[in-house]
Amino acid sequence: MEKVQQTIRAPRGTELQTKGWVQEAALRMLMNNLDPEVAEKPEELVVYGGIGRAARNWESYQAIVDSLKTLESDETLLVQSGKPVAIFKSHEDAPRVLLANSNLVPKWANWDHFRELEKKGLMMYGQMTAGSWIYIGTQGILQGTYETFGEAARQHFGGSLKGTLTLTAGLGGMGGAQPLAVTMNGGVVIAIDVDKRSIDRRIEKRYCDMYTESLEEALAVANEYKEKKEPISIGLLGNAAEILPELVKRNITPDLVTDQTSAHDPLNGYIPVGYTLEEAAKLREEDPERYVQLSKESMTKHVEAMLAMQEKGAITFDYGNNIRQVAFDEGLKNAFDFPGFVPAFIRPLFCEGKGPFRWVALSGDPEDIYKTDEVILREFADNEHLCNWIRMARQQVEFQGLPSRICWLGYGERAKFGRIINEMVANGELSAPIVIGRDHLDCGSVASPNRETEAMKDGSDAVADWPILNALINSVNGASWVSVHHGGGVGMGYSLHAGMVIVADGTEAAAKRIERVLTSDPGMGVVRHVDAGYDLAVKTAKEKGVNIPMMK
């Protein structure tokens, strides 16, 4: 991949570079994904998650930018794995962009085949929000991480993580949310990363409190704060596959154990034991097969240590990076003895159509986001947990790139919020249109048997019709851009998922599109879980009037 040293930053304000606000939103969000404040390796078009890219190569990026600048408001741009391939006449209520990233026929859906295609310049890895142009930095996963640790606290520690120690690893774009999510819940956390730059970045953005290269220092500080029942996050430089076994050997057992290293990609995401970053990069280039094997062996040691900690009483869970599957394939037959985070903590939220709803101020003015915060605090005042989140986010979350906010809203709530935001743009309360989107990790938009759809009640974990239906209904209902991806989060062969973005530009046409899209999108989550037999989803569907023909 050619590296290009240029600083990309989304335009701010109300002056258009394009022929309409929906096209402008797509252009600004693509560029925002590659803002150095937001992206992990912008010079390689990598946004987050190992090699999750915003465009296939620099030539494709420029062609997408040029296409968006000339795209009419009754045309649709098609993007195939990060490359613009067609512009068709459509209509004003159609999506302005349709994206399909990293999709492979099942028999060929593996990293080896993907890499062959990538080498030939025929494909890119879009992760989830990298290739769909709605990544907002680490805040994008923060509330989900906060909710996960909060639910763990409710289930196991009396509602708070005060006086507990969490051990985790991986401080990239996704995992970087963990330190702040734990401290927001009152706990102490040691978060390991092999790359000093990742830890430095989290400290700079106030997601992590301190840095150390010493396990002894990390443990001493952790114990001190644990005893005081005060929160602190400690970024520890090192390799988790070395440090976790060492802690097991010393008979040190944290209260909570998880992991968010980029284990979904053994070649580009995980560093084997005994290698510096530089040595790993050299081996990756010279002998990728050996590198992958060493990575998998290290991951197996990593999972073995997590299992040992679980046996000693640690609440242990997989945080969606497919590390258990790798260890299982390497012969560790009890790798799945600890659960994934969705069945353990998040599924009840999915049953209510809740998920990581986000919005971005295209103006670039933080005041626009603060005004929308007030909407949440006013309109959803009865939801104290949600309001607490907004108040904490305001105080503790630093914006990356265009100002944005995330909060988990459910069926009915998303459409209500979208209507209000569109009215605020229309009457000038907000200085420019707002982009509304979400992660692909949502209630009705993903099939991922080792993560979002793990251990479904009816055994339908691998049924992939749902994300396709989600993308189809969002497209016909007028989402501004819609994406269908493969392999996000857990790697090639293990997931299919869809994303949507809708622009609130203050027009009456946008109001109608928002109402349709922000109803059907979370509605798919309710439908998915009703179909799988979840009582809470049935209750939600009946209370909210979701029309499901065969619901009992």
Swiss-Prot record:
Cited InterPro entries: Urocanase, Urocanase-like, Urocanase_C, Urocanase_central_sf, Urocanase_CS, Urocanase_N, Urocanase_Rossmann-like, Urocanase_sf
One Gene Ontology term of the molecular function aspect: urocanate hydratase activity
Residues noted as binding NAD(+) in the record, renumbered to the chain: 49-50, 127, 173-175, 193, 239-240, 260-264, 270-271, 319, 489
Localization terms from the record: Cytoplasm
GO cellular component, one term: cytoplasm
Cofactor: NAD(+)
Top EC category: lyase
Principal location listed in the UniProt entry: cytoplasm
Keyword NAD: yes
GO biological process: L-histidine catabolic process to glutamate and formamide; L-histidine catabolic process to glutamate and formate
Keyword tags: Cytoplasm, Histidine metabolism, Lyase, NAD
Domain of life (superkingdom): Bacteria
Similarity comment text for this entry: Belongs to the urocanase family.
PANTHER family attached to this UniProt entry: UROCANATE HYDRATASE (PTHR12216:SF4)
Protein name from the UniProt record: Urocanate hydratase
Organism for this UniProt entry: Bacillus cereus (strain 03BB102)
Gene that this sequence comes from: hutU
